């Protein structure tokens, strides 16, 4: 991901898609530009923007860089395995999302970005809904002097199908030390 991002002068944030949004049985592009990047972010540290707020910090940061005319890259070619929101106890589920926390979370983003964000009721809970269409015109721009290589560099990787239990299933395989 970093090698890909380094080709461009204006990619501010990049990261992998959640595996549950990129099912292997579906056809996806290698990446999607100018949308949100959740949880696992590769960030250009020269940005003037910093984390802020209590909720949706990743979405807020993405929206601020997109509004500056920069780009984000969400990779489908690489995914991250993460438990679906509010399916595990602890962390944000207990601290931020209990009681009216889901509504507060959604409303905070709508208040920060009323031009593109609103509160909606989806999946039996309050959610934020962001319209990323205004950022379609943010075009990826190669760095000065970058020459695209000929051919395909697979970096020594092979695509294989692995039928193993999920990292979050109770039957996940562990080694002798108890590590995955």
Describe these PLM feature segments.
Residues 1-64:
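Conserved catalytic core of nucleotide-sugar-dependent glycosyltransferases
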Residues 53-55, 59-180:
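C-terminal catalytic/acceptor-binding lobe
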């Amino acid at each position: 991901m970093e090698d890909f991002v380094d080709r461009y002068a204006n990619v501010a944030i990049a990261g992998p898609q959640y595996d549950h949004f990129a099912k292997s049985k579906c056809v996806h592009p290698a990446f999607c530009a100018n949308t949100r990047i959740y949880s696992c972010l590769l960030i250009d540290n020269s940005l003037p923007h910093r984390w802020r707020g209590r909720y949706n910090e990743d979405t807020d940061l993405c929206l601020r860089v997109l509004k500056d005319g920069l780009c984000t890259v969400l990779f489908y070619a690489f995914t991250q395995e993460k438990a679906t929101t509010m399916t595990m106890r602890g962390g944000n589920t207990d601290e931020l999302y209990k009681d009216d926390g889901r509504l507060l979370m959604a409303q905070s983003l709508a208040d920060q970005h009323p031009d593109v964000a609103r509160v909606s009721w989806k999946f039996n809970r309050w959610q934020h809904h962001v319209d990323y269409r205004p950022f379609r015109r943010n075009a990826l721009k190669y760095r000065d002097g970058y020459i695209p290589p000929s051919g395909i560099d697979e970096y020594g990787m092979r695509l294989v199908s692995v039928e193993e239990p999920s990292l979050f299933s109770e039957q996940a395989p562990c080694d002798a030390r108890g590590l995955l």
